[in-house]
Amino acid sequence: MSKTIAINAGSSSLKWQLYQMPEEAVLAQGIIERIGLKDSISTVKYDGKKEEQILDIHDHTEAVKILLNDLIHFGIIAAYDEITGVGHRVVAGGELFKESVVVNDKVLEQIEELSVLAPLHNPGAAAGIRAFRDILPDITSVCVFDTSFHTSMAKHTYLYPIPQKYYTDYKVRKYGAHGTSHKYVAQEAAKMLGRPLEELKLITAHIGNGVSITANYHGKSVDTSMGFTPLAGPMMGTRSGDIDPAIIPYLIEQDPELKDAADVVNMLNKKSGLSGVSGISSDMRDIEAGLQEDNPDAVLAYNIFIDRIKKCIGQYFAVLNGADALVFTAGMGENAPLMRQDVIGGLTWFGMDIDPEKNVFGYRGDISTPESKVKVLVISTDEELCIARDVERLKNTK
């Protein structure tokens, strides 16, 4: 038996989960926040307990040392050599990585070069990879890329209708994101439906603070809503989603606070979406509270959100020429029954109908009625388990 750590490292955080493999049992999980800042926080959950420490953690190497020491201190492992593999989530793999890979010096260098495609994510992932390689150099490190699942898209789908030199010279194209989540819930949907994935047409809706929707044909991604970056697609928690690109130079001309394109993109990424329109929050629970209070800005934000998601799902029915099931996953997808109800309410023409008694908070499974031609499923995503599985598969191929 072996133990594998799944890592999701950001610029100032390191989220982790420890598995017993191949049993896929979760032994512990936690997160280290505010890396590089004063009063960093390390949280460890195991055996029904929760331990929290306030520390000064200067970089990812210190964070990894604290994580490993905590595993021993709390008796979760007896020695480092019980850990046989580490899997790292990497947002952008570009066209270089069509599947998960074992890390070597060249892979790490390429991940850092691809930071231009995910400047908020890839540098943190690279820092986490370096830290584990420095501290545990003899164990297998594997990179699992958010974009890999979407490399099956056809060229006419992933290219933008701009001069091709921008793709040839600068690799401007649709890459997508959340691929690990979309892959996992599609596999789970096939099990739930009792049919081979290779026979199914699925639309998977990952609706959390980030939102992406994918058309899955026979187990492969044929289209997805996120694009060159995770800013594209429907409205999200703090991201605008798709807008007319001519808005960007217009805002630079009109608003003295927006000095250049980077300022506008920052606004579109961090100050837009549900948060920007409502002026309340990026959290759907706060938006729904605003609905109860008849807050007009909350109502407007909610209506735009529902409208954009319905439109995206509808276009993927056209891409797939129909679908066997629609899958909701991630924070809002799993835990916002009102949102699911209102999205489906605009898609009944496609033959979808949900059972109100099943469409409640906390329910997982098939929420459609027996008469529904298209099944509607709620499935909890598990990107960490996908990462651990890939480590188990690849760790003997070094």
Curated annotation (Swiss-Prot):
Species of the source: Streptococcus pyogenes serotype M1
Superkingdom of the source species: Bacteria
InterPro entries: Ac/propionate_kinase, Aliphatic_acid_kin_short-chain, Aliphatic_acid_kinase_CS, ATPase_NBD
UniProt binding sites for substrate: 89
Gene3D superfamilies: 3.30.420.40
Pathway(s) the chain acts in: Metabolic intermediate biosynthesis; acetyl-CoA biosynthesis; acetyl-CoA from acetate: step 1/2
Protein name: Acetate kinase
Active-site residues, Swiss-Prot/TrEMBL: 146
